[in-house]
């Protein structure tokens, strides 16, 4: 996988109450990922960019909600999230990332 693809796979961290709880209890982090990203690609991207060891990757597709607008019905974008379990003793500090 080339360097450019590594940066396109991970779109950014997903911050929510559930993600924070998982980070504290299960040593998991949650990322928003590209719609066409596969589990092995996501694992390689996280290991290369953050220099950590990944134990497992679970992916979920979330369909965008249908919303009513002034011009009729609209739809929010679909998103894909990856739940990444890190090896014990590993962590990702989002503040110190280059």
From Swiss-Prot:
Q: Which GO terms describe its cellular component?
A: ribonucleoprotein complex; ribosome
What the entry lists under InterPro entries is as follows: Nucleotide-bd_a/b_plait_sf, Ribosomal_uL23-like, Ribosomal_uL23/eL15/eS24_sf, Ribosomal_uL23_CS
Write the signal peptide boundaries.
none
Cross-referenced SUPFAM superfamilies, in alphabetical order?
Answer: Ribosomal proteins S24e, L23 and L15e (SSF54189)
Which keywords are on file for this protein?
A: Ribonucleoprotein, Ribosomal protein, RNA-binding, rRNA-binding
Fetch the Pfam families from UniProt. Ribosomal_L23
Molecular functions per Gene Ontology: rRNA binding; structural constituent of ribosome
- Which Gene Ontology terms describe the biological processes this protein takes part in? translation
Q: Which PANTHER family match?
A: 60S RIBOSOMAL PROTEIN L23A
Q: What does this protein do?
A: One of the early assembly proteins it binds 23S rRNA. One of the proteins that surrounds the polypeptide exit tunnel on the outside of the ribosome. Forms the main docking site for trigger factor binding to the ribosome.
Q: Which family does it belong to?
A: Belongs to the universal ribosomal protein uL23 family.
Instruction: Outline the subunit composition.
Output: Part of the 50S ribosomal subunit. Contacts protein L29, and trigger factor when it is bound to the ribosome.
Q: What is this protein called?
A: Large ribosomal subunit protein uL23
Give the organism's phylogenetic lineage: Bacteria, Pseudomonadati, Pseudomonadota, Gammaproteobacteria, Oceanospirillales
The gene coding this protein: rplW
């Amino acid at each position: 996988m080339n360097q450019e693809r590594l940066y396109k796979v991970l779109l950014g961290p997903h911050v929510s109450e559930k993600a924070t709880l998982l980070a504290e209890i299960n040593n998991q982090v949650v990322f928003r990922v590209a719609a066409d990203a596969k589990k092995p690609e996501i694992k390689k991207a996280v290991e290369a960019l953050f220099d950590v060891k990944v134990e497992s990757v679970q992916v979920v597709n979330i369909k965008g909600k249908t919303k009513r607008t002034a011009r009729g019905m609209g739809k929010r974008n679909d998103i894909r999230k990856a739940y990444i379990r890190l090896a014990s003793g590993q962590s990702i500090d989002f503040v110190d990332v280059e």
